[in-house]
Amino acid sequence: MLDKNNPCISNLAQCGLTLEKLEKLSVKSNLGVSFVEDLGRFSKEELFKELQTVTDHYNNEAILTTIDIPFRIKDLNSMLHNYERYYYTKEANRVFNDILGFRSVYTNYDDVLAMELPEQFRISDMSHGKTIDDGYRGVHLHYQMDEFHYPIEIQFNTEWDLQFNQWLHKYVYKKSIPNIIGALLRRYYENGKIKSETDFKEVLNGGIFNRKE
């Protein structure tokens, strides 16, 4: 059971995202391989055939129309990019953990991190950055019924972090730009030197990272 007294859980429920709906939205793989296994254990052809089926399913899922939280369904090109990037280093459930992803804007991360959750949930705390910092900030909640079901992701961001994350996604991610650039841009954002999308682009394109701090 979810702790309904937690304001974060209460907010999700008010928007229609309940544990019962997460269970109904969960899709079980028919490949017969646990998602805790490395990607190399999967047939690439069969995996992507199933991923296409899963995305088609979500694109026609009526339950999603009853949930008042922004969501997105990942496209196959993005999944292929992640597959090729992490083929030798990641478990499948760490790569395909956000085919269906919800995004909740919240005032702070304390309530999110304080949630008491059933074993089907896993929290990834990136409120102070990733292990290898690329500028992103947030807390991700992954729901997975068992190791043969595709995970569902719920992203929690403050409005301030969400704004910067969106600029990162638009101008930095998937463009072969080193992680350190995102981390440096974040520093400028926190120091007040980046206050708008225009500022972000000017700092990114202005060669400022060739200078000594």
Task: Specify the residue positions occupied by each region the protein language model found.
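Short low-complexity stretches enriched in small and charged residues
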Residues: 20-23, 54-64, 105-114, 198-199
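Sparse, context-dependent recognition of short Cys/His-centered cofactor- or disulfide-binding micro-motifs
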Residues: 7-10, 64, 84-91, 124-128, ...
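Surface-exposed, low-hydrophobicity interaction/linker segments
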Residues: 28-87
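Long beta-strand-rich cores associated with HINT superfamily self-processing modules
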Residues: 91-203, 210
